[in-house]
Amino acid sequence: MMPSTTLSTVLSDINEFVVKQGHGVKGLSELGLQTLPNQYVHPPEERLSSMDVVSDDSIPVIDVSNWEDPKVAKLICNAAEKRGFFQIVNHGIPLEMLEKAKAATYRFFREPAQEKKKYSKENCPTSHVRYSTSFLPQIEKALEWKDHLSMFYVSDQEAAQYWPPSCRDDALEYLKSCELVSRKLLEALMQGLNVNQIDDSKESLLMGSRRININYYPKCPNPDLTVGVGRHSDISTLTLLLQDDIGGLYVRKLEHEAWSHVPPVKGALVINIGDALQIMSNGRYKSIEHRVMANESNDRISVPVFVNPKPNDIVGPLPEVLASGEKPVYKPVLYSDYAKHFYRKAHNGKDTIAFARIE
């Protein structure tokens, strides 16, 4: 435990220690805190209590060992429409590769603060790599109990030059291994939207860009007072999440105030529909609010891969969806504009989708 005088100095300027010096929330947690710093205390309405959780409800787990089976596509489309979240098993990515991605996450976050801060907004020479804490610490009223490293994939050459050596090779290998799974998922989902083939223009729109994050949620002295990640929906087409065996991801039930825990399943990937696909499907597929809760017993990690349109793509309801005369619910928007809108404010549920909604 850090001496009380030093601890009080750190607590007097959390931003300096956590953000500027690069220690992150992990460094704060390792000081031996007995109580949560005020900067991380969230208002009661943003905390999740046991009364809000539906204990007997879980999202679907789909065996995708035979992608060509029409029943698999039907299960995927049904889950996308009714839940927005599902898990897949037997997806073809070896368990060893999943474990290597987790190990790479631990390696990076165990680096000294001075090494990690090389990848902060202030120090990194590229905007495609970013080490940060919380979501938008500069504007959030209450900070999230989380550190993360985000790596936007441009090319192998750029990754070799800018991604942290401690996690680069395994993170890149895992990101690439998710590409085939993403395509198979999208082929199934497009069947439900009367899109028979993913041509070059559709491929750009659906999966033109990719980003991998590695997330670290340290154990917390007062987890009931804070959040790991606040309520939000992703702006991606799809998100493929690898989580460890700790748990802590909660998903809102469609049209309910209740939340469901997403239990870790060994070897599984958690799949969720993003805002971009909700817009493209004209609301048929659901991008659902989710959040991560802190815990006091264990550190937790996760590795999401975000499959997105290209920044210069126009995202709107697909022509095939509207071909039967269905009225559009969303207007076409430039994806980069939509993303900027998302990153301009703190997490607040599904507020971002209103940016594309036709009034």
From Swiss-Prot:
Reactions catalysed, as given in the entry: (E)-4-coumaroyl-CoA + 2-oxoglutarate + O2 = (E)-2,4-dihydroxycinnamoyl-CoA + succinate + CO2; (E)-feruloyl-CoA + 2-oxoglutarate + O2 = (E)-6-hydroxyferuloyl-CoA + succinate + CO2
Keyword Oxidoreductase annotated: yes
Keywords recorded for this protein, A-Z: Dioxygenase, Iron, Metal-binding, Oxidoreductase
Cofactor binding notes: Binds 1 Fe(2+) ion per subunit.
InterPro entries: DIOX_N (IPR026992), IPNS-like_FE2OG_OXY (IPR044861), IPNS-like_sf (IPR027443), Oxoglu/Fe-dep_dioxygenase_dom (IPR005123)
Binding site for Fe cation: 232, 234, 290
Cofactor(s) required, per the database record: L-ascorbate; Fe(2+)
Stimuli inducing this protein: Transiently induced by fungal (F.oxysporum f.sp. batatas O-17) and chitosan treatments, in association with the accumulation of umbelliferone and its glucoside (skimmin) in the tubers.
A Gene Ontology BP annotation from the UniProt entry: coumarin biosynthetic process
Sequence ranges assigned to domain Fe2OG dioxygenase in this UniProt record: 201-309
Keyword Iron: yes
pH dependence per the UniProt record: Optimum pH is 7.2.
This enzyme's EC code(s): 1.14.11.61, 1.14.11.62
Pathway noted in the entry: Phenylpropanoid metabolism
Amino acids binding 2-oxoglutarate: 217, 300, 302
Tissue: Mostly expressed in underground stems and stems, and, at low levels, in tubers, leaves and petioles.
Enzyme class name: oxidoreductase
Record GO terms (molecular function): 2-oxoglutarate-dependent dioxygenase activity; 4-coumaroyl 2'-hydroxylase activity; metal ion binding
Family: Belongs to the iron/ascorbate-dependent oxidoreductase family.
Role according to the record: 2-oxoglutarate (OG)- and Fe(II)-dependent dioxygenase (2OGD) involved in scopoletin and umbelliferone biosynthesis. Converts feruloyl CoA into 6'-hydroxyferuloyl CoA, and p-coumaroyl CoA into 2,4-dihydroxycinnamoyl-CoA, but has no activity with caffeoyl-CoA.
Name under which the protein is recorded: Bi-functional coumaroyl CoA and feruloyl CoA ortho-hydroxylase F6H2-1-8
